[in-house]
Amino acid sequence: MYEQYSSQEFEEKYTYSGNLGAFWTPEKTTFRLWAPTAGAVSIRLYRSGDPGADDLLAQLRMQPDVCGTWTAERFGNLNGIYYTYLVTVDGQTREVCDPYARTTGVNGCRGMILDLASVNPPQWDTDADPHAGKSITDAVIYELHVRDLSSAPSAHIAHKGKFLGLTETGTKTRGGHPTGLDHIKALGITHVHLLPMYDFGFTDESRRHPQYNWGYDPVNYNVPEGSYATDPFHGAVRVAEVKQMVKALHDNGLSAVMDVVYNHVYDAGAFCINQIVPGYFSRISSDGKYSNGSFCGNDTASERSMVRKYIVDSVCYWADEYHMDGFRFDIASLIDTVTINEIMAAVHQKHPNVIFYGEGWDMRTELTKPGVQLAVQTNSAMVPGFGFFSDTIRDLLRGTTFESTAPGFVAGAVVSKEALEACFMGMPSWAAQPDQCVNYASCHDNTTLFDRIALTAPDAPVESRIRMNNLAAAFYMLSQGVPFLQAGEEMLRTKPGKHGGFDDNSYRSPDSVNSLKWATLDKPEYQDVLSYYKGLIAFRKAHVALRLSTREDVQRCVHPVYCENEHCVAFRIDEPEGEIFAVFNADAQPVSVSLPDGHWNVNIRDSRAGTETMETVSGTVSVSPISAMVLTRRKAIEVVAGLIWDKDKFLICQRPENKARGLLWEFPGGKVEAGETLPQALQRECMEELAVKLDVRDRFMQVEHKYPDIFIRLTLFHCVISEGVPQALEHNALRWIHPCETKNFTFCPADADILKEIDRVYGGSKPL
C-alpha cells in the first residue's frame, strides 16, 4: 500500500504546488486540503477550540479539485472560528486538525481561522533581523528553553515559563545582577536558539502548571506551543505572544533561531497527515513497521514530494509570519539533501540572511526511494550553507558521550593533537567550509559541561573544575566555525539528579532540575565565570580572523604551532592588520611557550578575558595550569623616511596641526604602497609632499613603534636631492638642521631611537 506513494505515477498525478490551508478575508474564508486517497471530505466549524465542547456551528462539504486537493468556501467573517476536517478513506471517517492550521485551541485539536495581522505588535512591519548582512561565522548562538529562562523564583520574571518571559527587562537577582533578557543581552551573544516552540505532545496545555518537556514531540508544526502562552484556550494569544517575544529579541539586538523537528512526529499513527493520507508522511517498511532511525518511533519520508512541500512551506511560514532569523534542524540527517536545499532556497528568496544548521549524525533509516542522499555531516558539500554540530570538538574537550566518566582534553586526558588542530580549524575532514561547523561543549542533550567535568574529574577541587570549564569555552569559542553554548553554561549550569548525581536526559524533568539558577550569580566565583565568557565573546567579535568563512582563508591564516607538552596545543592566526597567538594548556602544571619574535599583548589569561591589554610581553611566556592564554599584536605598517642631507644639515618636517601627532617634527616620507620597494615609496612620497626628486642611498636604520592608533615599522635611508627645492606642500613647516640641533625640536615618538643613533654616530655635521 505505502509503496504507491513513492511511485512516479502517484507523484506526477498528485503533487500540488499551490497554497494549502484556510485563507481568511473579511468577506470569506477559502479552504484547501490535500487528500488524494479520500472518498469524501467535510469541514466542521466550531465556536471554541476546546475539543470537549459541544459547540458545532456548521458542517461544509468540500469538493474534489486538482492534484488530489479538496476545496470549499464559507462567506462571512470567520475570524476567531475554529475548524476541523472530516476525512473518509476506505470507509473510515476521521476528524483531524488541518496540517496547515496557523493556530489552534487548547492541546491542538481544533484549528483556528485567524486574521494574523490583527495580532501583530506595534512596528511589526519594520521589524528586522539585527544581524542581517553578516556571516553565520559572526554569530554566537545561545541555546535556550523558553521555560528554563524564567521558571526559577530567583529570576524575578513575572511571566514564568511563558513566551512573554523573554520580553521582560529590568529583572535582577537579589544581589542586583541582571536576569532573563537583560542577562542574555549583556553576555554579548548574537542569536537566541529556542528549543521547540511549535505545538508539541506530552504536555497538557489545559493544566495550570503543565508538565515540563523539551518539545521534541511535534503535533502541529505551524502552531505555537500553548503551554508557553498566557492563555492556551484562545488561539490568537499564542500567536500574538510569540510575535511579541521575537520583537523584544530584535529590539534588544538579538536574532531568533527556532529549533525544528521535521525528522519525526510525536505519534505517527495519530499525526494529521497520516490520518488524512494513511502512512504517507512516514517511512514504513513493506511489513508495515515504521522506520525508527530517530529513536522516537518513526521517521519522516521527506523524499516524497508532498512531505517535502509541507516542510518547505512550514519553514517559510515561520520565517515570513514570525520573522525567525534561523532554524536548527533536529536530526537533519534523516532529511534528504534535496529537501534541505529547497528549504534554504525558498527561505532565502525573501530572507537571504536566515541561517540554517542542525544535527548530522549518521542514523539508519528505511528510505522509500532509491538514490536518496541524506543531510549527514559527510554530505556537507551537498548542502552548502547548512551547518552541522561538531561532535568531535565536543567529545575531545569533555570526553566521549558514550562513556560518562571518560575524561576529555580539559580534564587531563591525552588526546590526538591532530584532531584538536582539525577542530580548531573548522573540521576540514567533513565540513566543506568552516561556516558549516558548529562548535560546542554542551547543549540540552546529555550532562551540562560543568556536570560532565565533575564526573570526569571527581577528585579535582572546584577551582580546577572551573578552570576546565573555562578552557573548554575558550577553545570552542575561538575555533573556526560557529560557536554555540547551552544557556547557563556561562554560570556553571548544573542539573542535579533525583537520586544524586546528575540528570543527563532532563527532557521531562521538573523545573527544579531544568531552570536556570540565577541566584548563583550573586556569588563571586560565578560572576568571574560570567565575566570570562563575556570577554571570550567580545574577543571573538573583535577579530575577523576567528570568523573566517572559507576553507582557503583558514588554510592561509591559521597555523598550528608545535608544543612539546602532550597536554598543550597552540596556534598562530594571521589577521589583516595583526596576529593572534593562542595557547591551550590542559596540564596541571604551567607550560613555557616561546612566542614569535616581537612584542605581544596579553588579552586572555587565567580567569580573565577580553579585548583590553593586560600586559605586553615578548620571548617566552608561562601559561598557567588548565588555562588558555591568547595574545595579539598589530602588524606593522611599513613606513619609509629620508635622512636628506645638504652638506652638514638634514631636512625635517612639521606635521599639520589637524593630523594625528599634529605639529610634531618628523623625517620626510610616508607609507609604502602595495608593489613598491622602500626606495620607490620614499621617492614617490617626497615628490608628492616636497616636490623634489631623491637619490636614495644606503639604509641608516629601522625601528618599530606602537602608537595608540597604529603600529609602524619605520625604515630610514640616507638621501640627497637630485632635482628641485623642497616645498611644504602637505606639512606645516620645513627646517634644515645640524644633528646637534635635534633637541630644539619635539619629534614624533617613533623617531626617538633614530635621533639617539644620529647623535651617537654623527654628533656634528655629515657632509655627503
Language-model segment annotations:
Residues 147-322, 332, 340-351, 355, ...:
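Substrate-binding/active-site clefts of carbohydrate-active enzymes
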Residues 35, 79-81, 614-634:
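C-terminal beta-strand-rich structural cap/linker in extracellular carbohydrate-active enzymes
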Residues 481, 485-498, 515, 519-580:
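Glycan-recognition and catalytic regions of carbohydrate-active enzymes
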Residues 114, 344-500, 507-509, 558, ...:
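Conserved alpha/beta catalytic core and glycan-binding cleft of carbohydrate-active enzymes
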Residues 25-39, 538, 558-596:
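Carbohydrate-binding surface patches
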Residues 635-650, 671:
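Conserved N-terminal beta-strand and adjoining loop/helix that marks the start
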Residues 1-26, 30, 52, 56, ...:
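The feature marks proteins involved in alpha-glucan
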Residues 635-638, 693-695, 702-725, 733-741, ...:
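Active-site-adjacent beta-strand/loop module that shapes the phosphate/pyrophosphate-binding cleft
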